């Protein structure tokens, strides 16, 4: 199965010059969704993780399914202000300003081995913030997996500089 066949490209969204890679078509197709989840699981065959973390919002869908297949728990990495219990946060830079991701203070146990999942890696800013946040909470992100990689935006190098393995199911040139 070629995961690219299930991904829709929308030009000039959310602004002119951007090619938006829409995975809702992958998620809504039973073959595409199962194939993507199975492929993400296969990327880490034999690896030892204690928990899967997924980045809001599409990382919840994929990460939850991967955690289920691996028989592991799931940690939601959320945007600021969305979690009901005590949180810790990690700020990261956007094109114009900053944002923050958060987890509950008790989400990560000391020295837990974490697999980080999201739908797409572009610049790697959000993923890097999630890695740093999990580390501050006492965990250790060993690897990250994405359905889509936009290689020219440098996200892979950003995570690899933190000694995080980066795997993706497909890549698209142009953004």
From Swiss-Prot:
GO terms for cellular component: cytoplasm. InterPro entries: Ade_phspho_trans, PRibTrfase_dom, PRTase-like, UPRTase/APRTase. This is Adenine phosphoribosyltransferase. CDD domains: PRTases_typeI. It is found in: Cytoplasm. GO terms for molecular function: adenine binding; adenine phosphoribosyltransferase activity; AMP binding. Belongs to the purine/pyrimidine phosphoribosyltransferase family. Its main location: cytoplasm. Keywords: Cytoplasm, Glycosyltransferase, Purine salvage, Transferase. Catalyzes a salvage reaction resulting in the formation of AMP, that is energically less costly than de novo synthesis. It comes from the Bacteria. Pathway: Purine metabolism; AMP biosynthesis via salvage pathway; AMP from adenine: step 1/1. One of its GO terms (biological process) is purine ribonucleoside salvage. Its EC number is 2.4.2.7.
């Amino acid at each position: 199965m070629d995961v690219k066949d299930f991904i829709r490209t929308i030009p000039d969204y959310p602004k002119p010059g951007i090619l938006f890679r829409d995975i809702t078509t992958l998620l809504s197709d039973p073959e595409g969704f199962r194939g993507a989840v199975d492929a993400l699981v296969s990327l880490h065959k034999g690896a030892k993780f204690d928990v899967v973390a997924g980045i809001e919002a599409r990382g919840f869908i994929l990460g939850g399914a991967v955690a289920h297949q691996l028989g592991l728990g799931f940690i939601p990495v959320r945007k600021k202000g969305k979690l009901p219990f005590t949180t810790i946060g990690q700020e990261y830079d956007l094109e114009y300003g900053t944002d923050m991701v958060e987890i509950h203070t008790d989400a990560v146990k000391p020295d837990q081995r974490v697999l980080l999942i999201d739908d797409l890696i572009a610049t790697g800013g959000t993923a890097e913030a999630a890695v740093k946040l999990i580390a501050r909470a006492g965990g250790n992100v060993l690897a990250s997996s994405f359905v889509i990689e936009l290689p020219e935006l440098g996200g892979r190098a950003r995570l690899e500089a933190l000694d995080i393995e980066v795997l993706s199911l497909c890549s698209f040139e142009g953004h």
